[in-house]
Amino acid sequence: MTTWLLLVAAIVSEVTATLSLKAALDRPGLYALVVVGYLASFTLLAAVLRRGMGLGVAYGVWAALGVAATAVLSALVYDEPLTLLMTVGLVLIIGGVLLVEGGSQAAGTRPDPLPHPGAHDGAA
């Protein structure tokens, strides 16, 4: 699985857990899904970092797209308000994420391959 697909999976897990948190208020059995969703999200985010994606990019994309997806889906699922001003804010968040990612690519930062287990830097 590519690093970006792992990040998308982390975002989907986090959004699922967050939406389930509201549903669990009325159906406590859903708290298990909340816990599993957050554990999966952080595990996948750690895998993304392990593959070499920069923390600023990975966390920025994860948090921003999680906020945007949660806002849109909570409007659809829970009939929560999504005003024009909120929508403009979400567009700005997504634009900011694109700028951060573009800046990362311009700086030449790419995910590094994992070091071979047992490899060392030669220091004694």
Predicted segments — roles?
Residues 1-124:
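Polytopic alpha-helical membrane proteins, predominantly small-molecule transporters/carriers
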